[in-house]
A protein has these predicted regions:
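Leucine-rich solenoid repeat scaffolds
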Residues: 81, 109, 125, 129-131
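Intrinsically disordered, low-complexity polyampholyte segments enriched for Lys and acidic residues
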Residues: 34-35, 42-48, 56-59, 63, ...
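Leucine-rich repeat
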Residues: 6-15, 34-42, 62-71, 90-98, ...
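Conserved hydrophobic beta-strand positions in leucine-rich repeat
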Residues: 23-27, 53-55, 81-83, 107-111
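Inter-repeat linker/turn residues at the boundaries of leucine-rich repeats
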Residues: 17-20, 45-48, 73-76, 101-104, ...
Length: 132
């Protein structure tokens, strides 16, 4: 495990917002929390080459999921977003589901080992019915 944390995520996000070649970024199990996900989300709004972002086993929670969902509204490059085991509940999934309605580029969203519950599953189901 690499301890990157929110400060490390900030530095990576600054570079990512300017990078034009990287397609995959694996940041699983690096101690990123909601603040770090905000930095990464802001970078995703500017980046148009990253296709895979792996944030499994971090601590972004519902707020972090909302930040990333907001970025998905603008980002048209990301194809795979790994968010397994991040403490995301139905509240966070609500924002991700709404982003899926608008974003037609993302085709893999991993929410394994989160407690999305029935509400989260319903939000995702509704979004998938309306995603074209």
């Amino acid at each position: 495990m690499i301890t990157l944390g929110d400060d490390g995520a900030m530095h990576l996000a600054n570079a990512l917002s300017k990078n034009t070649t990287l397609t995959t970024l694996d940041l699983h199990w690096t101690e990123i929390e909601k603040e770090g996900s905000l930095y990464l989300a802001n970078a995703l709004k500017k980046n148009n080459t990253l296709t895979t972002l792996d944030l499994k086993w971090n601590k972004i929670g519902d707020e972090g999921a909302q930040y990333l969902a907001d970025a998905l509204g603008q980002n048209k490059a990301l194809v795979t977003l790994q968010l397994a085991a991040n403490g995301i509940s139905g509240k966070g999934v609500y924002h991700l589901a709404n982003a899926l309605i608008e974003n037609t580029t993302l085709n893999t969203l991993n929410l394994d080992s989160n407690k999305i519950g029935t509400d989260g599953a319903q939000h995702l189901g509704n979004a998938l019915c309306n995603n074209s």
